[in-house]
Amino acid sequence: MPRRREVEKRKILPDPKFQDRIVAKFVNNLMREGKKSTGERIIYGAFDQVEQKLKDDPLKIFKKALDNVKPVVEVKSRRVGGATYQVPVEVRQDRRTALAMRWLIDYSKARGEKTMQEKLAGEIIDAANNRGNAVKKREDTHKMAEANKAFAHYRW
């Protein structure tokens, strides 16, 4: 953290196809070794598959899936005396989105389909329908926070 001034957040330009900043952010998260065009190809291909399977606007389905994966609370480790407690804290809005994107990508990679487009499309459809591993991760995070609610007074 710099002492001089608050660092301004970098502006993300909207993606070329949907003119949406969240999709552009998702492309940036998916991108490996600076290959943005490959990331865009994967996402747009996945969106095409989602549109074919559900006959609905893929952007709307993607945003619904993202909302279903966003965590509200998480636990952070806090050391008090000799003990480490898992303290539940509310998640900031930008971190919610970042975690949801990361979980969607991670659990897409772990799926059994052949191509990344198919994996991502499958995970987006599952998340939009409130099932799948990314949604399970959010539920587990919420359960962990609920179980450690007794330590909420250690918040900082």
Swiss-Prot record:
Keywords: Ribonucleoprotein, Ribosomal protein, RNA-binding, rRNA-binding, tRNA-binding. GO terms for molecular function: rRNA binding; structural constituent of ribosome; tRNA binding. One of the primary rRNA binding proteins, it binds directly to 16S rRNA where it nucleates assembly of the head domain of the 30S subunit. Is located at the subunit interface close to the decoding center, probably blocks exit of the E-site tRNA. Belongs to the universal ribosomal protein uS7 family. Pfam families: Ribosomal_S7. One of its GO terms (biological process) is translation. Coiled coil: none annotated. PROSITE patterns: RIBOSOMAL_S7. GO terms for cellular component: small ribosomal subunit. It comes from Anaeromyxobacter sp. (strain Fw109-5). This is Small ribosomal subunit protein uS7. Part of the 30S ribosomal subunit. Contacts proteins S9 and S11. The gene is rpsG. InterPro entries: Ribosomal_uS7, Ribosomal_uS7_bac/org-type, Ribosomal_uS7_CS, Ribosomal_uS7_dom, Ribosomal_uS7_dom_sf.
